[in-house]
Amino acid sequence: MRRFRSTLAALAVAGFATLAASAAFADTTLLNVSYDPTRELYKAVNEAFAKEWKAKTGDTVKIEQSHGGSGKQARAVIDGLQADVVTLALQGDIDQIAKAGRINPDWQHRLANNSSPYTSTIVFLVRKGNPKAIKDWDDLTKDGVEVITPNPKTSGGARWNYLAAWAFADQKFGHDEEKDKDFIKKLYANVPVLDTGARGSTTTFAQRGIGDVLLAWENEAFLALDELGADKFDIVVPSLSIKAEPPVAVIDEVVDAKGTRKVAEAYLNFLYTPEAQKLIAHNYYRPSDPKSADLKDLARFADVKLVSIDDPLFGGWAKAQPKHFADGGIFDQIYQPKSTN
């Protein structure tokens, strides 16, 4: 089996796992707690960083990985998971870790681009030939269309999905929040199951054959074409989407206790180097420094109108998180779980 198919199969057994790896021969071991669909990216980055660190310092470093829905991962770190670094799906999740006292409040200003070494967006993955003729967000609200997306309570990607749909509705209905809510309610009425993370939703759609369209991270959609077959799926780019900015941070409490700050900071800084930026683009993420990427990797990214979380429509994560995703927020108001009877 190819690597992506193997990852999907493994996810069915364990939705949250650390890569099994002995640190017996490592001078330093770091734990990178990341969001769901970054496995392939960080496998490549970790190998490159370990090689560079060895050449620079003579020391051996081992980076272990943990993956799951971004919100779930943030909660694990808040509850005591000893992560040296987090590479999560959105600022709001790292802010929650900072509020718990495990990260210094200034974390987002330590690295370039608000500590986001790459960006992504949300696209649609449909079955080959696009049998339901899905072209844009309003097609997702039609009768007879099944939409696969994760749970925004646990998944960062799911929150980006929701906000992209909200931005489309707001543009369509002229900033009428009640109509925006109704649009989102209709969309989620077409969702048969909410997985906890993005990779789980990919499994549901691609492996289990459920649904007509998957709301996917752009990188996850390209990876599905590459690993599961371009003869099985098509990518549809909507007229408008969201500028997803996944940030990274050192867990100050952990690195100071373990004495791993120097290597942990070097690891995150490495993400901004030309070598890592090239790997980022090759793994289907949009690099913060496009000049470092291969042109053939950049060519796959569609030119699409992207709305920022800092747009007045959302007002940043400090406003968007409680308004839309907190207990009793808009998502709770509009979503009715499917009956299991």
Model regions and ranges:
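Short helix-loop capping/hinge motifs at secondary-structure junctions, enriched
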Residues: 129-135, 154, 167-175, 254-262
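Cleavable N-terminal signal peptides
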Residues: 13-14, 24, 36
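Periplasmic-binding protein-like
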Residues: 116-120, 182-188, 195-196, 228-261, ...
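Short beta-strand->loop
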Residues: 33-35, 126-128, 146-173, 188-191, ...
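Extracellular/periplasmic juxtamembrane helices and adjacent flexible linkers that interface
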Residues: 255-341
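N-terminal segment of the mature folded domain
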Residues: 27-155, 295-298, 335
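Ligand-binding pocket segment of bilobal, Venus flytrap-like solute-binding proteins
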Residues: 172-239
